């Protein structure tokens, strides 16, 4: 039976009749910036024929999914250029990542900055030549024959059915479905000039890449992210829909570098990372300690007002606790090795006369909070019970991923665990989310969206029914908030789904902040109960909640958000008083004393430095308020304000100046 000449499609929401064999290139010829198409919800190359009855949408290169395809295609062009310049280079993987892409290579020598320039220059020629990306479906035998000289591709073919768990980026190359190879095809001859094992999709032509790409750096990387594997050389790059978009991104990067909390932490004398302590273990200096204490003190106050009760737990515990909780089954790789202690041996024979025990540094506070709940009988009248702790936890992070304060090995979590009835669950989740958002706003973050992390089918405890109920409840609470909700399939911890609050900072970057996790499983594992109103014993629901994530990480984020210019209530030094000349030291010293009496952190700069240098020093230290006084000020009983932005307010009466400063601190105003 012959194929029908015409078929019906839904194209960008409109029903259309087209000829059989129509491709995305045919449909979207009038939309030259279309990167790929979405066919029944899946991304396809534009060159593919569209089946009858399909729903088809164009995806522009400026859209998030379009940018991902652009970056993936640019990674292929980069790999082609590398193999032209270094014919012996073996291909690893080359996925898109946030704002960019990378490709791994097995090469004899690391790439140099000069190499990156040559690669980039050749990429520009490939882009201008307008090579087509051609998709081919092949069987495994054909794929192995074509990839015979690419050992890493052959390894991936062997992991085809488990690519999602095979390692970093493997799922970009192969998966449980078809095996596909993408050719880069010379426009003039029609010959394939380069190919790679890849699931795609890709742009229709290299010309669509344009000139909005750049190679950023090279680094060593273990194959599939496993440090037991061979170390390869990785080239990172970024790609955007236009040169202007690339320039804007590079400007954001430069601004992010200026705001880097590691640099500012050293410049402002806030914290450091002594080699003697080890990777990921920061120490806070007095100035940083002030900020941290202010953060903690305000958080404690707000938690007290919200009905939380404070608890304290130790830093180590016997192994059995984490066997009960499931952490040793599901989280062992994130824990430090055990300490084996209390073993006794006969001094003469060396034989063990008393068995020792394994103790672990705690990676999480929840098991210990469960023990507090279980320490006595509980009644429904006590619920919801909200336990809160600034609890120190220790997590083994590979040295390569440790990063300043935002990825550490020893951290302090503002950790709360809420125990409630199922009837209270939804209201408590709503209250908790609102509390989290309000408190983050008090610290100066105001732009949020939510992410819902759901079950990893390979890594969870409890029944599917319990997970479905927990996920549904969290989704309802998140949607009721009115904030954008983004799915994160498989991103939950092993014991329950979670909402995470994503906050946008001053330069538009998104940070994961607070997490709210619903858990029916740990109460079961710890046999937690309460006596219900009808006298029966019931299982409570447990809500895990970390507001800052960790104190360390949150301080790192705030340092970059404010570029070190903290609002007055958080600033280590809130006021620096600078006399125009030494003769006015005593006058300003009296002003400083009055400010200190109001609880303001104020200092008189009576150093021997000249006046201009004192002003520069205060600006460098990012003091919120600089008070200046000379002869006219003393005669009028006034001071002059100098603000961070260089503006001044002269001749302000001392009492008014003190009142303004106290108000700014107590009302947590953002100072200029």
From Swiss-Prot:
Its cofactor is Zn(2+). CDD domains: TGS_ThrRS (cd01667), ThrRS_anticodon (cd00860), ThrRS_core (cd00771). GO terms for cellular component: cytoplasm. SMART domains: tRNA_SAD. Its EC number is 6.1.1.3. The keyword Ligase applies. Residues 260-567 are annotated as: Catalytic. It is an enzyme of class 6 (ligase). It is found in: Cytoplasm. It catalyses: tRNA(Thr) + L-threonine + ATP = L-threonyl-tRNA(Thr) + AMP + diphosphate + H(+). It comes from the Bacteria. Residues 2-60 form the TGS domain. SUPFAM superfamilies: Class II aaRS ABD-related, Class II aaRS and biotin synthetases, ThrRS/AlaRS common domain. Keywords: Aminoacyl-tRNA synthetase, ATP-binding, Cytoplasm, Ligase, Metal-binding, Nucleotide-binding, Protein biosynthesis, RNA-binding, tRNA-binding, Zinc. PROSITE patterns: AA_TRNA_LIGASE_II (PS50862), TGS (PS51880). GO terms for biological process: threonyl-tRNA aminoacylation. GO terms for molecular function: ATP binding; metal ion binding; threonine-tRNA ligase activity; tRNA binding. Catalyzes the attachment of threonine to tRNA(Thr) in a two-step reaction: L-threonine is first activated by ATP to form Thr-AMP and then transferred to the acceptor end of tRNA(Thr). Also edits incorrectly charged L-seryl-tRNA(Thr). NCBIfam families: thrS. Belongs to the class-II aminoacyl-tRNA synthetase family. Homodimer. HAMAP family: Thr_tRNA_synth (MF_00184). This is Threonine--tRNA ligase. The lineage of its organism: Bacteria, Bacillati, Actinomycetota, Actinomycetes, Micrococcales. The gene is thrS.
């Amino acid at each position: 039976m012959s194929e029908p000449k015409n078929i019906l499609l839904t194209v960008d929401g409109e029903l259309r009749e087209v000829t059989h064999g129509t491709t995305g290139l045919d449909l979207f010829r009038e939309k030259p910036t279309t990167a790929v198409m979405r066919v029944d919800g899946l991304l396809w190359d534009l060159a593919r024929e569209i089946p009858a009855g399909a729903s088809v949408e164009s995806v522009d290169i400026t859209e998030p999914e379009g940018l991902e395809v652009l970056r993936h295609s640019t990674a292929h062009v980069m790999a082609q250029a590398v193999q032209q310049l270094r014919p012996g280079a073996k291909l690893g993987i080359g996925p898109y990542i946030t704002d960019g892409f990378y490709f791994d290579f097995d090469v004899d020598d690391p790439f140099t900055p000069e190499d990156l320039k040559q690669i980039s220059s050749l990429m520009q020629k490939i882009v201008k030549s307008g090579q087509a990306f051609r998709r081919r479906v092949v069987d495994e035998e054909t794929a192995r024959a074509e990839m015979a000289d690419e050992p890493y591709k052959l390894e991936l073919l062997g992991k085809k059915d488990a690519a999602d768990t095979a390692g970093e980026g493997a799922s970009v190359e192969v998966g449980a479905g078809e095996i596909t190879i993408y050719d880069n095809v010379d426009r003039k001859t029609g010959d394939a000039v380069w190919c790679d094992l890849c699931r795609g999709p890709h742009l229709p032509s290299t010309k669509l890449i344009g000139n909005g790409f750049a190679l950023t750096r090279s680094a060593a990387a273990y194959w599939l992210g496993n440090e037991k594997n061979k170390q390869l050389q990785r080239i990172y790059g970024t790609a955007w829909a236009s040169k202007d978009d690339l320039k804007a991104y590079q400007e954001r990067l430069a601004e992010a570098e200026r705001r880097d909390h590691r640099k500012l932490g050293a410049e402002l004398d806030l914290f450091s990372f002594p080699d003697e302590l080890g990777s990921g273990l920061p120490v806070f200096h007095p100035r940083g300690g002030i900020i941290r204490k202010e953060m903690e003190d305000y958080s404690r106050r707000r938690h007290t007002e919200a009905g939380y009760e404070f608890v304290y737990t130790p830093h180590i515990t016997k192994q059995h606790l984490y066997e009960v909780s499931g952490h040793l089954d599901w989280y062992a790789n994130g824990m430090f090795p055990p300490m084996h202690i209390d073993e006794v041996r006969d001094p003469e024979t060396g034989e063990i006369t008393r068995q020792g025990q394994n103790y672990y540094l705690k990676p999480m506070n929840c098991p210990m909070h469960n023990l507090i709940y279980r320490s006595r009988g509980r009644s429904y009248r006590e619920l919801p019970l909200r336990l809160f702790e600034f609890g120190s936890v220790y997590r083994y992070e590979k040295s390569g991923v440790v990063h300043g304060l935002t990825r550490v090995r020893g951290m302090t979590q503002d950790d709360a665990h809420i125990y409630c009835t199922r009837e209270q669950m939804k209201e408590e989740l709503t209250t908790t989310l609102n509390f989290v958002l309000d408190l983050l706003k008090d610290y100066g973050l105001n732009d949020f969206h939510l992410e819902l992390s759901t079950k990893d089918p390979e890594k969870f405890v409890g029944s599917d029914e319990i997970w479905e109920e927990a996920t549904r409840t969290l989704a309802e609470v998140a949607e009721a908030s009115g904030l954008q909700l983004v799915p994160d399939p498989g991103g939950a911890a092993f014991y329950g789904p979670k909402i995470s609050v994503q906050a946008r900072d001053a330069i538009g970057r998104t940070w994961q902040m607070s997490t709210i996790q619903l858990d029916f499983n740990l109460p079961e594992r710890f046999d937690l109960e309460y006596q219900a109103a009808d006298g029966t014993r019931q299982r409570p629901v447990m809500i895990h909640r970390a507001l800052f994530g960790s104190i360390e990480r949150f301080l790192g984020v705030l340092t970059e958000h404010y570029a070190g210019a903290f609002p007055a209530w958080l600033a280590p030094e809130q006021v620096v008083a600078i006399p125009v000349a030494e003769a006015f030291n005593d006058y300003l010293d009296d002003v400083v004393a009055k400010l200190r009496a109001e609880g303001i952190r104020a200092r008189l700069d009576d150093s021997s430095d000249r006046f201009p240098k004192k002003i520069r020093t205060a600006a460098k230290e990012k003091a919120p308020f600089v008070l200046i006084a000379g002869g006219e000020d003393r005669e009028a009983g006034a001071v002059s304000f100098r603000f961070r932005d260089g503006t001044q307010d002269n001749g302000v009466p001392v009492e008014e100046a003190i009142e303004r400063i106290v108000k700014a601190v107590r009302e947590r105003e953002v100072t200029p």
